[in-house]
Curated annotation (Swiss-Prot):
Cell location: Cytoplasm
Record family assignment: Belongs to the polyribonucleotide nucleotidyltransferase family.
PROSITE patterns referenced in this protein's UniProt entry, alphabetically: KH_TYPE_1, S1
Lineage of the organism: Bacteria, Bacillati, Actinomycetota, Rubrobacteria, Rubrobacterales
Role played: Involved in mRNA degradation. Catalyzes the phosphorolysis of single-stranded polyribonucleotides processively in the 3'- to 5'-direction.
Main location: cytoplasm
UniProt enzyme class: transferase
One Pfam family here: RNase_PH_C
Catalytic activity: RNA(n+1) + phosphate = RNA(n) + a ribonucleoside 5'-diphosphate
Protein name as it appears in the record: Polyribonucleotide nucleotidyltransferase
Length: 686
């Protein structure tokens, strides 16, 4: 069975019934030649003891899909790439809110990349495929969803599902997902576009999403499985019992500027409520308390028009920004907003340390990297340390995307750049604090960024047509609210967006209002950062490596490298520098000592310079013959000093060795270069 859904001038093609027929639902989704097999399967029984939806979404990249063999000794795929993890998160986020409440069956969604055509990204294809697989399966699901990427032509027109090449030229890369009624997820990177451009893109996307969702819904009604009967559990009897006596007290307990004090108040209430209860009643009482907390929270915001920390809805928390907080590190920034604190550190290196990518995408290197760390102590807890979790990878990628548009080009700043953001305290919006801390670190390190970038997380509490939009949400507002909408940008425009919904979606009009409120908050934060450091420092840190860039003729590349790398290795050893050469003749020379770098550059210029008549060299005699001596002017380039020119005046020299021997150093002038590129020399007296 086949379904073709138009997307702009092209179409996404869905097929089912041929591959993976034992999966709960299986769809092959194709756009261009990029093809993803999406499957959705559930367990036969609910997971024992589950208190949340046990949904897992994974992306399996197969290097054969791009005609490649994996690198490394094993020559097979290993752990998921960063792109696979980010695509799994992108697929997970819009579908997770659409499962029934208290649905505890294990649900596994897998997207296997079968073809990566190097032209069309596979992430949106995976999202649409996953939606269709769930719709066809017997799994209860409040979708289907649609998904589309929107780019922008240089002339301002929008492009639906742009190619990699079109994205290179686009100032907007926004992925939007949602149901036929509303938007449920947004993920975007941009080059300082205005809020109006983003809203226009959302409106364009919403129309495409509606068409996709309706088409998949009709297709599933015709070809899908009958949905698993599932009745949501009835009302917890303890909710009504506790509401009258405790709702106001819970609401009072939520009001505090101190996260720990709020937790302690709720913990005391828990102890009081479970005291004297039977073993069977305790989990029901705790569940009732959790429900009443959410109810109290919503009453506080929608009826009392108050926040738990008593800020105005558009007010940011007390904020401080500090630059240069650590010695020797190439650049540092400490950003504190309320009970969220992030320390960002900059490391600069020569371009030999750019990240090499072995992925399904055309991009093969990454020069600017941002890594985010979230240790357990940041929330006052214990926990495991180890490889980064998906959340850390996702938050790091978002902060990286927010800053990428202002990072100077390789020609302007020939360094590999790595930022690490260490979350020291967390009570909401740590990824946006990472953006702010990273901006401080970059400017402190003398990286000539185009403009400072700040970020703020927006929230929403909504019941029917009544809603409040929140600026700079803290952890409780993220947990109990309906939206987490992160917005980063400069004074001139947006550089990154990420939105996740816990309700079934919001309109583009509401998001427009949230974007404007976010813009005002972002400008306040940028003002605070500007008071600490207004622009990048004029020089990089004394402890950072020095990099100089020179251009040599392409026909001199072999001369610089030498046989088996002999010449370039000798230069690196002699001057204590790293030298890398590009195919176009660009040479990067990096070292800790500036004088050593300059000396190495001088040597490279000398050896790769075109020899011209009249040039004077100090060279070593490399060979003597009965008619003269050969003098090395530059590595691999010799000239002949004829025996007749070994002595001053017309004095005759009978044997070359009477004047010069191999290994002697002599000062010579270039007399001429003949048509066969042979060089004639004469002695120069000191």
């Amino acid at each position: 069975m086949r379904l073709e859904i138009p997307v702009g001038e092209r179409a996404i093609v869905l097929e089912t019934g041929k591959l993976a027929r034992q999966a709960g639902g299986a769809v092959t989704a194709r756009f261009g030649d990029t093809t993803v097999l999406s499957t959705a399967t559930r367990s036969e029984e609910p997971r024992p003891g589950a208190t949340f939806l046990p949904l897992s979404v994974d992306i399996e990249e197969r290097m054969s899909s791009a005609g490649k063999i994996p690198g490394g000794f094993l020559k097979r795929e290993g752990k998921p790439s960063e792109k696979a993890i980010l695509t799994a998160r992108l697929t997970d986020r819009p579908i997770r809110p659409l499962f029934p409440k208290d649905y505890y069956y294990e649900v596994q969604v897998i997207g296997t990349v079968l073809v990566a055509d190097q032209e069309n990204p596979y992430d949106v294809v995976s999202m649409v495929g996953a939606s269709a697989a769930l719709a066809l399966s017997d799994i209860p699901f409040g979708g289907p969803i649609g998904a589309v990427r929107v780019g922008r032509h240089p002339d301002g027109g929008f492009i639906l599902n742009p190619t990699y090449q079109q994205l290179e030229e686009s100032d907007l890369d926004i992925v939007v997902a949602g149901t036929k009624e509303a938007i449920t997820m947004v993920e975007a990177g941009a080059r300082e576009v205005t809020e109006d451009v983003v809203v226009e893109a959302l409106e364009v996307a919403q129309g495409v999403i509606r068409e996709q969702a309706e088409a998949i819904e009709r297709w599933a009604a015709e070809h899908g499985e009958e949905k698993q009967p599932f009745e949501e559990p009835g009302e917890n009897p303890f909710v009504e019992e506790l509401r009258g006596a405790y709702l106001e007290r819970i609401k009072e307990g939520l009001i505090s500027t101190d996260r720990r004090a709020r937790h302690e108040a709720i913990d005391l209430l828990k102890e009081e409520l479970v005291e004297g209860r039977s073993e069977e009643e305790v989990p029901l009482v705790l569940d009732a308390l959790a429900q009443l907390q959410k109810e109290a929270f919503r009453k506080l915001y929608l009826e009392d028009r108050k926040r738990t920390d008593l800020r105005a809805f558009d007010e940011i928390r007390p904020t401080t920004a500090e630059a240069h907080v650590l010695p020797r590190v190439h650049g540092t920034g400490l950003f504190t907003r309320g009970e969220t604190q992030v320390l960002s550190s900059l490391a600069l290196a020569d371009l030999g340390l750019v990240q090499r990518l072995d992925t399904l995408e055309p991009q093969t290197t990454k020069r600017y990297m941002h890594h985010y760390y979230f240790p357990p102590y940041s929330t006052g807890e214990t926990g495991r340390l180890g490889p980064p979790r998906r959340r850390e990878i996702g938050h790091g990628a978002l902060a990286e995307r927010a800053l990428l548009p202002v990072i100077p080009s390789e020609e302007e700043f020939p360094y590999a750049i790595r930022i690490i953001s260490e979350v020291l305290e967390s009570n909401g919006s740590s990824s946006m604090a990472s953006v702010c801390g990273s901006t401080l670190a970059l400017m402190d390190g003398g990286v000539p960024i185009k403009a400072p970038v700040a970020g703020v997380a927006m929230g929403l509490v909504k019941e029917g047509d009544d809603y409040v939009i929140l600026t700079d949400i803290q952890g409780l507002e993220d947990h109990m609210g309906d939206m987490d909408f992160k917005v980063a940008g400069t004074r001139d425009g947006i550089t990154a967006l990420q939105m996740d919904m816990k309700i079934t979606g919001v309109s583009a009009e509401l998001l427009k209002e949230a974007l404007e409120q976010a813009r005002r908050g972002r400008l306040q934060i940028l003002d605070i950062m500007r008071e600490e450091i207004a622009e990048p420092r004029p020089e990089i840190s004394d402890h950072a490596p020095r990099v100089e860039v020179i251009q040599i003729p392409t026909d001199k590349i072999g001369l610089l490298i030498g046989p088996g790398g002999k010449t370039i290795n000798a230069l690196q050893d002699e001057y204590g520098v790293n030298i890398s050469v590009e195919n176009d003749g660009t040479v990067y020379v990096a070292g800790v000592e500036g004088m050593s770098v300059k000396a190495a550059v001088s040597a490279i210029k000398g050896m790769t310079k075109e020899v011209e008549a009249g040039d004077i060299y100090v060279g070593k005699v490399v060979k003597t013959t009965n008619f003269g001596a050969f003098v090395e002017l530059t590595p691999g380039r010799d000239g002949l000093l004829h025996i007749s020119r070994l002595a001053p005046g017309k004095q005759r020299v009978r044997r070359v060795e009477d004047v010069l021997n191999e290994g002697d150093v002599v000062k010579v002038r270039v007399l001429e270069i003949d048509k066969q590129n042979r060089i004639s020399l004469e002695m120069v007296e000191d």
